[in-house]
């Protein structure tokens, strides 16, 4: 039964895509969030000024944050997690004690998008408020 329902869902999505219909935010293509070359260059300059770096092995940005203790790091991560969930855009991150390493990219298209830039800006504000 689950296989049938899964197939029906896939068929529904395919038909909607062929008709050009939207299925909502969850099914929205990252194409609508792609950066132009000019937007990307400006975003990278702004993010680098804030301490972010581009990864050489893939189209992503990275930054490590340090806090006074684990509680501050965890509070920061909780705040970012709530925003990421609202955006339906989730960071790759790693936490040890007071350090949080964050990588942002859009996995569905394999590149940096407006969503990554927006989340990075939120992350900066969240870190500054800890």
From Swiss-Prot:
EC number: 4.2.1.96
Enzyme class: lyase
Pfam name, any one: Pterin_4a
GO CC aspect terms: mitochondrion
Subunit structure: Homotetramer. Interacts with DYRK1B.
Organism listed in the record: Homo sapiens (Human)
Reactions listed under catalytic activity: (4aS,6R)-4a-hydroxy-L-erythro-5,6,7,8-tetrahydrobiopterin = (6R)-L-erythro-6,7-dihydrobiopterin + H2O
GO molecular function terms listed in the Swiss-Prot or TrEMBL record: 4-alpha-hydroxytetrahydrobiopterin dehydratase activity
Keywords: Acetylation, Lyase, Tetrahydrobiopterin biosynthesis
Post-translational modification N6-acetyllysine, affected residues: 114, 118, 125
Function, as annotated: Involved in tetrahydrobiopterin biosynthesis. Seems to both prevent the formation of 7-pterins and accelerate the formation of quinonoid-BH2. Regulates the dimerization of homeodomain protein HNF-1-alpha and enhances its transcriptional activity.
Protein name: Pterin-4-alpha-carbinolamine dehydratase 2
Residues recorded with modification N6-succinyllysine: 114, 118, 125
Database matches in Gene3D superfamilies: Transcriptional coactivator/pterin dehydratase
Alphabetical list of SUPFAM superfamilies matching this protein: PCD-like
Similarity-based family: Belongs to the pterin-4-alpha-carbinolamine dehydratase family.
């Amino acid at each position: 039964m689950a296989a049938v329902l899964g197939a029906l869902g896939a068929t529904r999505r395919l038909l909607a895509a062929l008709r050009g219909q939207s299925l909502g935010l969850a099914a929205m293509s990252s194409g609508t969030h792609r950066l132009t070359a000019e937007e990307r260059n400006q975003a990278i300059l702004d993010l680098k000024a804030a301490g972010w770096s581009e990864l050489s092995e893939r189209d992503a940005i990275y930054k490590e944050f340090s806090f006074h203790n684990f509680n501050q790091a965890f509070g920061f991560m909780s705040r970012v997690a709530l925003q990421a969930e609202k955006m339906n855009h989730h960071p790759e991150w790693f936490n040890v004690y007071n350090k949080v390493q964050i990588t942002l990219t859009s996995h569905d298209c394999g590149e940096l998008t407006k969503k990554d830039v927006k989340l990075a800006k939120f992350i900066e504000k969240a870190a500054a408020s800890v």
